[in-house]
Regions:
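Short, conserved "active-site rim" segments that organize catalytic pockets and cofactor/ligand binding
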Residues: 3-85
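Thiamine diphosphate
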Residues: 88-101
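Well-ordered alpha/beta subsegment
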Residues: 104-108
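Short, intrinsically disordered/low-complexity patches at protein termini
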Residues: 53-54, 101-103
Length: 108
């Protein structure tokens, strides 16, 4: 599994981003996760991050977007808040993720 670069992120579309999340969720349901070197991913994302999707989810400690979608470090911008509602702070984070960081998809 690779860490996204600016080039790979730019090739992603909303459709391919959603497909990645669906495939990852299927792996999660089947308890078959991709093998990742987390130490390597930390190094590879140290100089920049190029997530392809933004996920707004509940603050519930039992649910992590990276786990339920079987994604690695730097793949998602995860925004967590009680009740999954959007206020100015959350909206600002979502705008940053899409406009400045280049995510292709927002999932609530």
């Amino acid at each position: 599994m690779y860490t996204h670069t600016q080039e790979t992120q730019s090739k992603m579309t909303p459709v391919s981003s959603l497909q990645n999340l669906r495939e990852g969720n299927k792996r999660f349901q089947e308890n078959v996760r991709l093998s990742r070197n987390l130490v390597q991913q930390v190094r590879e994302t140290a100089s920049g991050q190029y997530p392809y999707a933004t996920v707004l989810s509940c603050i519930d400690s039992r649910v992590s977007s990276e786990l339920i979608f079987d994604q690695g470090m730097g793949d998602l911008f995860s925004i967590r808040i009680a009740g999954n509602f959007v206020n100015e702070d959350i909206l600002g984070s979502m705008e940053f993720a899409c406009k400045l960081a280049g995510t292709k998809l927002v999932v609530v």
